[in-house]
């Protein structure tokens, strides 16, 4: 059986998936963040305070949505391994970048140009972080 595929329909589905992930994770952000609640079956409720743990608990019925979820989860894990914190912020920033990029694709922009632009932004922001950073020489600092 032949399956109909629409690129714009898939892009809209991806944007909706990213919105759902963003809405689930942003409740845990910051010192006043709220707990997420997951249902594990057998009347088992879990309260989750971390955005990265909440990401691991999410699951979508659509395989394309799960791919996006796993990509964002990998970004949050890498951020946590490097800095020990910031996984929720990484997820939210990545969601916003992906939503913006997908909206540009829907409007007909070239994906290579979007990718090159995001790479330039990453290098620029890395340089700014290094410019404003202060070296630490002692553990007490």
Regions found by a protein language model. Give the residues of each.
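N-terminal glycine-/lysine-enriched basic segments
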Residues: 1-141
